[in-house]
Amino acid sequence: MVSRKAVAVLLMVHVAVMLASQTEAFVPIFTHSELQRIREKERNKGQKKSLIVQQRSEEVGPLDPVEPPEEEENEVIKLTAPVAIGTRMNSRQLEKYRAALEGLLSEVLLPARNDK
């Protein structure tokens, strides 16, 4: 059999874990001065990037807005991971939007059936 002390210790650990999981505690990783330094670095990076973009735009000159550049014209986006497109609803939302969803599904499915 398991001793009462072991059960008591396990119960206390379980309660402590449950309380810790429910509380939202803030534990500072950085000091205030470190955070200020990090923000300053980020600000400097942003200024550098905007300066570089401005210099490049001055070098290239104005583009014809009607004609897209060749690079953008031939650009193809390839997905590296499968993408799930969809919406999740709970039962209350499903009841609320049932008529609209049925209408949308019938619009999509009827042309598919007519093509066959």
From Swiss-Prot:
Broad class of the protein's primary localization: secreted
Keywords: Cleavage on pair of basic residues, Hormone, Secreted, Signal
Leader sequence residues: 1-25
Ranges where the record places region Disordered: 39-74
Gene Ontology CC entries for this record: extracellular region
A GO molecular-function descriptor: motilin receptor binding
Localization: Secreted
Pfam families: Motilin_assoc, Motilin_ghrelin
Keyword Cytoplasm: no
Family membership: Belongs to the motilin family.
Protein function: Plays an important role in the regulation of interdigestive gastrointestinal motility and indirectly causes rhythmic contraction of duodenal and colonic smooth muscle.
Name of protein: Promotilin
Biological source species: Felis catus (Cat)
